[in-house]
Amino acid sequence: MRRAVSVMGVMGVMGVLLGVSSPMAQAVEWQTFDPSPYSQSVTDCDREAAHPDDPNKVLPGRTSREMNLDTAIRVCRVDLAKDPNNPRISYQLARSLTYAGKVTEALPFIERAAAQKYPQAMFVVGYLYLEGSYASPKNPCRAAQLIRESAIYGRLAGLLGYPSYVLNGRFEGCGLQADLSELREFVSKAKKSKLEYYPSVLVESLEVRLRQMEGVK
């Protein structure tokens, strides 16, 4: 069990307003995505649509500017038809469709990959629902669930994004009672990664804010 953290005075009021609590809670039950049930053979879809930041990519990936969207959509459709249960291919088809302005068509594919606990898909579809990017429907409460789960599966963007969004009140109205100790564990795990400059700055900022919330000087 982790110790309960006393949040007093102004910090206590902030916690109530942000929907952040500090109960006695179990340590985060970290999960790991297992890609072994799915083919790891490189496909044309991987060549055209892998994301550089996807931890489960099988090639270095392409930025959105480097992608030929028509080609990516075509080859990913073909490859997914050959391997319909592969969450990596589902995600990459969804990525291509989203960039092409076809987010309504993309969402079922990325939701399918998220349901299979593909970390990149969980974070990205959560982000889409949070921001309404590419004209996707806004659903901040669903976003909270997905981004948190991506953090539990170790996705760096989720490990840093979820605490930041919670502390900034982005999930307000969702009935979320985020555990401060969980948020600290997310940030701590992210800190152990090989961070580039901007993520490292965000880690430092989040650590300061969490200490303030906990009343630790």
Describe the predicted segments one by one.
Residues W30-P37, S41-D44, G173-K217:
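Terminal, low-structured helical/coil segments at or just beyond the last alpha-helical repeat
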Residues S41, K82-P87, A115-M122, E131-S133, ...:
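Short helix-capping/linker turns of helical repeat alpha-solenoids
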Residues A50-D53, T98-G101, G126-P137, P163-C174, ...:
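Short coil/turn linking the two alpha-helices of tandem helical-hairpin repeats
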Residues A25-V75:
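N-terminal leader/linker segments that initiate helical-solenoid repeat arrays
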